[in-house]
């Protein structure tokens, strides 16, 4: 690294940050995270702010590089039609010819995120034709404490419930589309943190208040039947079978599992087939413990 390179990169990243600032979709989702979190670093854009970028030094980058780009902090995943032994031999030969400094493993410090939201309701005006709206649900993982269900399955049950209530075939989505409350898609994003599940549901709609009201009511129903569970499990199994035709998708999923759980879920098919209505109801019943935030991006003329 040189000071010249650092200065050049500062300019490039600053331009990117300014571009994000002008994108309503980005501001909707990350604005929601900013409203939900109080201490968790996920409240910030990965790119940081312009003032953050200006403070970065050559020495900061060297420390980050040595901590991040080191074999002790890496894993390799190869998917496709190849000889595993040959692949391992090639990688081992290449790595044996390289020298690396002693690895100073970073100490991970997690800030305890409180069970509250920074902002319950937030509005801003941007260059949009139709208001963009999001509702964020913050569900504490300790709500499921005492259940004899491992954390991976809890997440699957939570995700299954959200698909039943808000997915493509859900009653709510059909209601909102048939009444023209929404005319486009409805996006759902699940964020799994150390202490919380955070689900953000977002749309473009001329009726933000009604949409927010119906989303909250639908989440609070906290009911699920056996037919729903069987239907969603079968859909998940079908998607899993098709998914294995996507080499890059498989690679990405393995990466996610290793990062999230420290290992790949080889038995995901068996896990899906073991999901049942009794456990689903136990998980759904505990969703009464949650808090919400709502974000609305309005057209400029409504300022």
Question: Model-found features: residue ranges?
Answer:
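Short, low-order "capping/linker" segments at domain edges
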Residues: 16-19, 116-130, 238-254
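Active/ligand-binding-proximal structured segments within catalytic/core domains
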Residues: 9, 16, 32-33, 135, ...
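Active-site-adjacent, His/Asp/Glu-enriched structural segments that form or flank metal-binding
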Residues: 1-22, 210-213
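Short amphipathic C-terminal alpha-helix that caps PH/PH-like domains
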Residues: 91-95, 157, 161, 211-220
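M16 family metallopeptidases and their MPP-like homologs
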Residues: 28-48, 75-79, 134-138, 173-222, ...
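A common structural junction motif
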Residues: 1, 94-102, 180, 217-226
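An aromatic/glycine/proline-enriched structural segment found at the starts
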Residues: 42-46, 70-71, 75-133, 137-142, ...
């Amino acid at each position: 690294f040189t000071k010249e390179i650092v200065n050049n990169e500062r300019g490039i990243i600053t331009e990117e940050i300014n571009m994000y600032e002008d994108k309503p979709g980005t501001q909707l989702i990350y604005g929601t995270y900013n409203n939900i979190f109080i201490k968790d670093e996920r409240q910030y854009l990965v790119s940081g702010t312009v003032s953050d970028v200006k403070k970065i030094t050559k020495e900061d980058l060297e420390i980050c590089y040595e901590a991040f780009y080191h074999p002790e902090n890496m894993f390799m995943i190869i998917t496709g039609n190849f000889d595993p032994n040959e692949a391992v031999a090639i990688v081992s030969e290449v790595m044996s010819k390289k020298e690396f400094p002693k690895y100073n493993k970073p100490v991970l410090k997690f800030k305890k995120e409180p069970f509250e939201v920074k902002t319950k309701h937030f509005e801003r005006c941007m260059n949009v034709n139709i208001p963009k709206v999001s509702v964020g649900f913050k569900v504490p993982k300790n709500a499921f404490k005492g259940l004899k269900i491992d954390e991976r399955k809890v997440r699957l049950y939570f995700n299954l419930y959200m698909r039943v209530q808000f997915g493509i075939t859900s009653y709510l989505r059909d209601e909102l589309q048939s009444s023209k409350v929404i005319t486009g898609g409805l996006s759902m994003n699940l964020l799994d943190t150390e202490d919380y599940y955070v689900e953000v549901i977002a749309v473009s709609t001329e009726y933000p208040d009604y949409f927010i009201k119906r989303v909250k009511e639908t989440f609070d129903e906290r009911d699920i039947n056996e037919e729903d569970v069987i239907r969603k499990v079968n859909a998940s199994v079908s998607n899993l079978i098709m998914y294995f035709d996507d080499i890059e998708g498989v690679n990405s999923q393995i990466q996610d599992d290793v990062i999230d759980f420290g290992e790949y879920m080889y038995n995901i098919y068996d896990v899906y087939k073991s999901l049942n209505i009794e456990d689903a109801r136990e998980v759904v019943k505990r969703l009464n413990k949650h808090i919400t935030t709502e974000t609305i991006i309005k057209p400029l003329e409504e300022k």
